[in-house]
Amino acid sequence: MTNRVVLAYSGGLDTSVAIPYLAKMTGGEVVAVSLDLGQGGEDMESVRQRALDCGAVESIVIDAKDEFANDYCLPTIKANGMYMKQYPLVSAISRPLIVKHLVEAAKKHGGTHVSHGCTGKGNDQVRFEVGFRNLAPELQIIAPARDYAWTRDKAIAFAEEINLPIEQSKKSPFSIDQNVWGRAVETGFLEDLWNPPTKDLYSYTEDPALGNAPDEIIISFKAGVPVAIDGRPVTVLEAIEEMNRRAGAQGIGRLDMVEDRLVGIKSREVYEAPGAIALITAHQAMEDVTIERELARYKRGIDARWSEEVYDGLWYAPLKRSLDAFIENTQEHVTGDIRMVMHAGKCTVNGRRSEHSLYDFDLATYDTGDTFDQTLAKGFVELHGLSSKISNKRDREAQ
C-alpha cells in the first residue's frame, strides 16, 4: 500500500517545503488540504495551484468561513476568550477545525499519515497532534519542520535551491498566520524584545493615531450571539467581517505581547484582531447587564480556564466540553443592544439596553423616590464583616 500523507497546507514557507520533503521521506504521495478561514490576501486558487507545483498529487481547498465563525469564533465570543487577558486566541481556535477537516480528508482520500509544518518550539504542534490523536489515533503523524530540525534559514535556502514557488525570502522572514478572527506575526526582528513593530507589519488595522472620525455603533445580541449591527441583521461571519472593517479603521485590536507558550518558553507575538476585540468588548458589556453577580463572578474564572484549555490545544478534551456547557447555560439572557464608540484604538461602551436587564433604576438611583431600603444596610455590613472581625480580634489578643 502506498503511503499517502495528508498535509495541512497554508501556502507559506514551511508547508511548501514540506511537500517535497514528505514525498521523499515516506516514498509516498502528498495530499494538500487548505482551508479558507476568511484570511483574505492571496486567492485560494493560487494556494491550491502552488501545492500542486510543489509536488502534491492532490490539492484541496475547503471554504470553512461560516463553520469557523459559527463553531469556533462564536464560542470564543461567549467565553470572552482572552489568553493572559489579552490574546483572543486567533490561531488557537483555527487549529481544531483544520484538524477536523484533515481527518475527514484522510478518510476520504486513503490517507495513512497526517502532517503539519509546525516547529518544535510552538504551540501549534500540540494543537494539531493532540487533535489528531483525539479524532483519528490510527493515523501516523509527521512533523518535518520539527523532527528534521528545519530552521527558517534552512527552509528558505532549500526552497530557493529547488525553485519552490513561494513568496517568502530572507528579506521577509516573518511567520504570519491570519484568518477572519485576526492576524498573528512573529519571528524576524520582533525576536528582539526592544525592537518596536514597524508600520508595515500591520494589515488589518489603521494607525490609531491617524485621527479618523469616531464611529458609533450598536451591536445587538440574542442569547450571546451577535445578530444585528445598527439594526441590520447579520450572520456571525458578517458581524466579524464588518467589525474587522470598522474597528480596524479605528486602529482597534493591535496587540504586542510576550506570551507564555505551552512548551515552556516566552515568545513575542504581534496580533491584530479588530473584530474579535470589538465583539468581545460588546459581549462582555451585555453580560454585565444581564448576568447575576455571583454567576458573573464565577464565569470570569471559567472564561479564563476555557481560554487556557483552547490555547493549550485541548479543544476536544472533556474539561473543555464541560466548560462549553456551563458557558452556554449562562447565555440564556444575554440579549439586548450595546452602543459603543470606536475611536483612536479604543472601544468605549456608552449605552446598554435589554429586556433581560438586571439593572433596576428605582433601586440604583440616588434621587428622591428610590426604592432601596437603606435601613437594611447597617445589619448587612455587620454580618458581612463578622467573620474577619472575629479572626482579627483573636489575632490581636494572641500578640
From Swiss-Prot:
Positions contributing to L-citrulline binding: 87, 123, 127, 175, 259, 271
Places the protein is found: Cytoplasm
Catalytic activity: L-citrulline + L-aspartate + ATP = 2-(N(omega)-L-arginino)succinate + AMP + diphosphate + H(+)
Keyword Hydrolase: no
InterPro entries per record: Arginosuc_syn_C, Arginosuc_syn_N, Arginosuc_synth, Arginosuc_synth_CS, Arginosuc_synth_type_1_subfam, AS_cat/multimer_dom_body, Rossmann-like_a/b/a_fold
Superkingdom of the source species: Bacteria
Major site of localization recorded for this protein: cytoplasm
EC assignment: 6.3.4.5
UniProt family annotation: Belongs to the argininosuccinate synthase family. Type 1 subfamily.
Protein's name in the database: Argininosuccinate synthase
Organism in which the protein naturally occurs: Corynebacterium diphtheriae (strain ATCC 700971 / NCTC 13129 / Biotype gravis)
